[in-house]
Amino acid sequence: DYNNNYSFVPEFGRDLMSILDVPKGSRVLDLGCGNGSLTQALTDVGYEAVGMDVSDDFLKSARARYPHLHFVEGNAVNFETDEPYDAIFSNAMLNWINDEDHPQMLKSVYDALRPGGEFVFECGGFGNNALIHRALSNAFASHHMKYQVPYYFPTIGNYATMLEKTGFRVIYAALLDRPTPLLGESGMRDWISMFIIKPFMGVAPDVKEKIINEAVSDLRSVLYSNKTWTADYVRLRMKAIRLYD
């Protein structure tokens, strides 16, 4: 259950809110709002927040949990707004977008901000879950298959360059190590099942089971201690301003 087992995802987003500098009452878009918990948190601190997500399931969950808030369906890569936002906020979403789609997504964000508006985000950064992906790569290789990391984890340098090419002024960037405890004895197996989908497409169920067992066994010596699994998260946190035209 994503809402219960991975509640650390929105929890980290609450800390990210601290680098928003727009005044209370500002219009803020929560881009990739998921279950809406951060849209509510943005509202709680005084922003006029709107949540946007491409997932019907997430939007249904968000509307059920927070019926008083405004949620819209939209794709981060291509979205438009009638009225520009003072800030666009995004937590743990950008690395789900294919790397080739990021320039277009940044253009959509830029166009949806007023001049001087802020884009504040955090996502998986360079080195994110590197130990987990290495273990999966080794396990796939032992079954004569190639593993490809199904997410885009940029460096500060390549993402700052992309933002600047779009017309943003980058004013803050950090790569943060964030080792994160996972729930229960099956925490690592559950994490792989929840977040690693694409590489297993077309893989027979029994082979998938063997690959996961091998990866988990491989990771036990580095990411399991005191009866707790830890995911080796690295987060890219950035803040950029849309320049005045």
Set out the residue ranges of the language-model regions.
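A short acidic, Gly/Pro-enriched loop at the edge of an enzyme's catalytic core
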Residues: 77-88
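C-terminal helical/coil "lid" or tail adjacent to the Rossmann-like core of SAM-dependent
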Residues: 171-227
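Short alpha-helix
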Residues: 152-166
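A short glycine-rich, Lys/Arg-flanked "PGG" loop and its adjoining helix->strand segment in the class I
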Residues: 103-118
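A short SAM/SAH-binding and catalytic strip from SAM-dependent methyltransferases
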Residues: 87-101
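Conserved class I S-adenosyl-L-methionine
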Residues: 1-26, 37-41, 120-142
